[in-house]
């Protein structure tokens, strides 16, 4: 504890219930947005320079999320905002 600070002066922070990303719904959303943009899994694979389409399939099934950099690129390719891709549980208090 820093000098001059006693327990009665400590700030108490309220725990905030942050939303969490719904992996399955986000994956389904990625697939839906990809199809709406007229892109194939192979198109995304080529655009990201992946050797195989496995990462794209993992995103679409909710087995994994794109990295932040890939999420930014995905949003640009799909002509949407990042918030349009991610689906949260909406449990913000």
Model-identified regions with their sequence ranges:
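Short alpha-helical DNA-recognition segment
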Residues: 37-58
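A short, Lys/Arg-rich alpha-helix, primarily the initiator
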Residues: 3-36
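Short amphipathic recognition helices of helix-turn-helix/homeodomain-type DNA-binding modules
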Residues: 47, 84-93
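DNA major-groove recognition helix of helix-turn-helix/homeodomain DNA-binding modules
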Residues: 69-84
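The alpha-helix within a helix-turn-helix
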Residues: 34, 45, 75
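Residues within the helices of the helix-turn-helix
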Residues: 31, 42, 72
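Residue-level signal for the short linker/turn that defines the boundary of a DNA-recognition helix
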Residues: 28, 38-39, 51, 66-69
């Amino acid at each position: 504890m820093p000098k001059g600070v006693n327990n009665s002066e400590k700030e108490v922070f309220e725990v905030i219930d942050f939303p969490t990303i719904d992996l399955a719904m986000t994956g389904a959303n990625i697939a839906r947005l990809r199809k709406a943009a007229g892109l194939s899994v192979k198109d995304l694979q080529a655009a990201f320079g992946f050797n195989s389409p496995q990462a794209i399939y993992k995103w679409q099934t909710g087995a994994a999320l794109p990295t932040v950099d890939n999420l930014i690129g995905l949003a640009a390719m799909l002509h949407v905002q990042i918030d349009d891709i991610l689906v949260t549980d909406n449990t913000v208090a």
